[in-house]
């Protein structure tokens, strides 16, 4: 069957405004509603209070010399304070970029070097991380601490009444101007900063808002490092909804308690987080009838596990979606129109969202031929939510000759134009829902004087964890070192998630193609086969 283009028209109701103008206007509109609640302390804040604090911090940042298109970085778990400098940056046309406190110094310093921030807002517990990272990146950046500090300015010192705050209005700008940088690994393996404009990100948020779910009360526990957390923030502003904040992690008992207490209507669970919920024996003791939608995505999840999620959250639509940091959500089911498909097509990623055009060119990776129904190939797409570019980096190689983004994901669509994603072309893999970039760990391995060659890949562990980082290593002649010593050497230089949990395996040579390219898949498959033989 010949290939075709899957497409859905744009929404017509998206406001043509900057993110600052949007947040300011909606905060005024819903000023008496609760904006967010800290589930740990039970403190809450209205949209009026949040807007007032954002204005004060915006004016304070201006006094510190922040000008339009300067980069402002936030490194913190999510609290009532965390989104204030984010929205304040929108108000003064600064560009926002976010880091996660669990990243290593090596990762953080690289990301900081990509964007050269003017100012960094950091939680008290992560000041040491930022100090070391700035030193390694050779950057001199203003540091502001959420909490107490004798060395740096504090967030509370910026959040003070300003004489002209009542007259404040957000700075106007071209809606195509970059306002958000979101870090992603990219298909080449090295992290990049993805540029989203006011238009692209507001469009992505409105598309999500119109997806048929109820966003009255969103449970939020990931940092703004993740694009999903940013979209949930903007989505809640659209209709004056509230977000329930519960730190960086949520245990199963807390999850069900919060759903019942705050009458949560929407949650997003990365597949790895669903296992805690489905393995929690007391889930029936909690009232989850308010929960309209459970959205899953980011990594693969089996149909078996999705059915378990359906069973635990019996009142909810459990939807598995597909999206990219470069675009936001691209395919998902609408619970108001696709009820039957949600239950019948377990494991499907849904249909294309508003403003998305998708080739299921799908594309044959060898011939570039556009494929048809139920034929697997690379997914390529265009979207009204597409990023502008990579910050200070060339992105031309990531698009084909027709302007479609080459996702590096393998998938197919069926006779109902529903998308399935089945594999990745990219060399990176995911462990506990986190992207692991092989080259980043390989660079650490090469710092060891005894390592001549090294290849890192993901070794399948189990459905919950995904793939664990594993290395095949060729030693220098005469080198006497053990696999355990190499593992410990790497562990001391990378984040916890990058540790070589799959082990280090010494080999005599690394197989390559006639053109000299490393045959990473063959190395991985040979090791898996060898381990299976040894088991038997």
Where are these regions (language model features)?
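Conserved AMP-binding/adenylation subdomain of ANL enzymes
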Residues: 202-217, 225-266, 280
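Gly/Ser/Thr-rich phosphate-binding loop
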Residues: 264-269, 278-344, 359
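Conserved pre-ATP/AMP-binding loop-to-beta segment of ANL
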Residues: 31-32, 150-151, 162-183, 190, ...
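AMP-binding/adenylate-forming catalytic core of the ANL superfamily
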Residues: 82, 120, 267, 383, ...
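Conserved ATP/PPi-binding loop(s) of AMP-dependent carboxylate-activating enzymes
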Residues: 351-357, 369-398, 418, 434-436
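Conserved AMP-binding/adenylate-forming
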Residues: 40-44, 58-103, 221-223, 435
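Conserved AMP-binding A3 loop
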Residues: 44-48, 179-203
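AMP-binding/adenylate-forming catalytic domain of the ANL superfamily
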Residues: 146, 495-517
């Amino acid at each position: 069957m010949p290939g075709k283009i899957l497409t859905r028209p744009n929404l017509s109701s998206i406001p043509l405004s900057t993110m600052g103008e949007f947040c300011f206007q909606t905060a005024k509109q819903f000023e008496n509603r609760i904006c967010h609640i800290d589930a740990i302390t039970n403190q809450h804040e209205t949209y009026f209070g949040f807007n007032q604090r954002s204005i004060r911090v915006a004016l304070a940042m201006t006094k510190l010399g922040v000008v339009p298109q300067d980069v402002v970085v936030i490194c913190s778990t999510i609290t009532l304070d965390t989104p204030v400098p984010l929205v304040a940056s929108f108000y003064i046309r600064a560009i926002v970029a976010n880091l996660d406190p669990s990243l290593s110094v090596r990762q953080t310093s690289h990301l900081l070097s990509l964007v050269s921030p003017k100012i960094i807002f950091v939680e008290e517990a992560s000041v040491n991380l930022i100090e070391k990272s700035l030193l390694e990146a050779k950057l001199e950046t203003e540091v502001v601490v959420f909490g107490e500090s004798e060395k740096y300015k504090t967030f509370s010192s910026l959040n003070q009444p300003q004489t002209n705050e009542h007259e404040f209005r957000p700075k106007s700008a071209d809606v195509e101007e970059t306002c958000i940088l979101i870090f992603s690994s990219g298909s080449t393996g090295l992290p990049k900063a993805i540029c989203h404009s006011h238009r692209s990100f507001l469009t992505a948020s409105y598309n999500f808002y119109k997806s048929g779910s109820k966003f009255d009360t969103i449970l939020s526990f990931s940092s703004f490092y993740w694009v999903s957390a940013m979209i949930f923030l903007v989505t809640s502003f659209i209709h004056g909804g509230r977000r329930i904040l519960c730190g960086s992690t949520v245990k199963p008992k807390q999850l069900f308690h919060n759903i019942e207490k705050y009458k949560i209507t929407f949650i997003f669970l990365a597949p790895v987080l669903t296992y805690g919920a489905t393995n929690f024996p007391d889930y029936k003791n909690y009232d989850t009838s308010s929960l309209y939608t459970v959205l899953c995505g980011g990594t693969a999840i089996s149909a078996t596990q999705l059915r378990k999620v359906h069973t635990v959250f019996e009142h909810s639509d459990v939807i598995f979606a597909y999206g990219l940091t470069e675009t936001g959500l691209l395919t998902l089911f609408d619970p108001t129109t696709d009820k039957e498909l949600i239950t019948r097509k377990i494991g499907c990623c849904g249909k294309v969202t508003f403003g998305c055009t998708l080739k299921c060119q799908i594309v044959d990776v060898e011939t570039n031929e556009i494929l048809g129904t139920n034929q697997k190939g690379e997914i390529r797409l265009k979207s009204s939510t597409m990023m502008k570019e990579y910050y200070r980096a060339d992105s031309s190689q990531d698009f084909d000759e027709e302007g479609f983004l080459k996702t590096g994901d393998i998938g197919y669509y069926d006779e109902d134009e529903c998308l399935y994603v089945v594999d990745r072309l990219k060399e990176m893999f995911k462990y506990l829902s986190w992207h692991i970039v092989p080259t980043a760990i390989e660079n650490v391995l090469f710092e060891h004087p005894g390592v001549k060659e090294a290849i890192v890949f993901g070794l399948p562990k189990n459905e919950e964890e995904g793939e664990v980082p594993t290395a095949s290593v060729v030693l220098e002649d005469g080198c006497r070192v053990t696999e355990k010593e190499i593992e410990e050497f790497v562990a001391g230089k990378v984040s916890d998630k990058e540790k070589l949990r799959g082990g280090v395996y010494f080999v005599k040579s690394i197989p390559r193609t006639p053109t000299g390219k490393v045959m990473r898949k063959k190395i991985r498959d040979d090791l898996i086969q060898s381990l299976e033989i040894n088991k038997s």
